[in-house]
Amino acid sequence: MSLLGKRIRAPREDDDLLDEGLSSSEELNSASGGDEDGELEDAETVRVPFLIYDDKELLEIADLPPIGQSDLEDSPSEKEGENDIESSLSQISFGALAKVQRSLGPLKKGSKRKHRGQEEEEEEEEQDNGNTKYKKSKLDALNELRERIRRAKEGKASKSGQSKDEEAAVKKQKESRLSKHAPAIQSSKFAVSRRRVVVDGENVAQVKSRDPRFDSAVQSYSHSHRLGSHSDPAAAKNYAFLNDYRDAELKELEEKLRRAKNEDEKQQLKKTITSMNDRKRALEHRDRERQILSKHRKRERELIKEGKKEKAWFLKKADLKKEALKEKYESMGAKQRQKGIERRRKKVASKEKKEMPRSRRMVEG
């Protein structure tokens, strides 16, 4: 009896059946009022419903490993236990079996013991149901996750739209100047046009013929290089006829400007005339400075020869400019001198105003 309790354990799904068998056996014992042998016999019949399975099924229900030949050989105690189980099973009477059957009640129609194949099919169905439930729960979780992602994207899109508007407002505020005198802020980025300009004759700079004797590179030499130097009086004297040519060309351009009717042509002629006048004034100013410098050198040499000076005094650039300006105003007429002085005064005042600090400039302005 003790060996049966140790080796044979009912599965979880048969717990209810075990409870029913125990309760029915107790009722039968109390009703019969038998002796101790009868009580023992009834107690033994409690485990009878679970002994209708064969040995392999009992081992599978109890989750025990199958008993092999090696196990029987290695464990003689287990062999003796099995012999005891077989002897106890052979000693159970048919009356005890009938009592237990009556206590359990009649078997329902179609409630026969299920075969192992049917049990496996039911287990597979339960697994399929569990898989379908798992799949459904997984699909629900995926749908919920997609909904959250969609909401997050919508919120992000709305925030990005607001941020773009704010950035545009900040950019517009930055572009506005603090003062009308401040330079305008303009981005250096610009869209590159897909249209490409093909190099043609109009866009190519025309090669101008030049005379190396009057080239600026040649004329920029120091005073030691006499040939080609702008301070060389011999070169200025030899090419003095070029000034007459320039004056004649200037008169022709002024006549063309007077007769021209096209606005573009007029603008081009005006630009050329202004450039020639500026060059003429620059040449006159240079000739004036050259004459002043030559006079100063001649005077210093005479003083040294007379013994009034031991060393020559070289004229500075600032003093040279002052002497040239003085000689310029002396050669002018009264009206021209007045206009020139007024123009000079405005130029100096504008220059001083630019160099003045901003606070003082605003007060005086």
From Swiss-Prot:
Compartments, as annotated in UniProt: Nucleus, Nucleolus
Keywords of the record, alphabetical order, are: Coiled coil, Nucleus, Ribonucleoprotein, Ribosome biogenesis, rRNA processing
Output compositional bias ranges, type Basic and acidic residues. Answer: 137-178, 258-268, 277-292, 349-365
Q: Does the keyword Coiled coil apply?
A: yes
Q: Coiled coil: which residue ranges?
A: 134-162, 242-286
Compositional bias ranges of the Acidic residues kind: 34-43, 119-128
Instruction: Tell me the domain of life.
Output: Eukaryota
- GO CC, alphabetical: 90S preribosome; nucleolus
Q: Could you tell me the Gene Ontology terms of the biological process aspect for this record?
A: maturation of SSU-rRNA from tricistronic rRNA transcript (SSU-rRNA, 5.8S rRNA, LSU-rRNA)
Show the segment(s) annotated as Disordered: 1-43, 62-90, 103-191, 258-299, 329-365
In the record, the note on similarity to other proteins reads: Belongs to the RRP36 family.
Which protein are we looking at?
rRNA biogenesis protein RRP36
Species of origin: Arthroderma otae (strain ATCC MYA-4605 / CBS 113480)
Q: What broad taxonomic lineage does this protein's source fall under? A: Eukaryota, Fungi, Dikarya, Ascomycota, Pezizomycotina
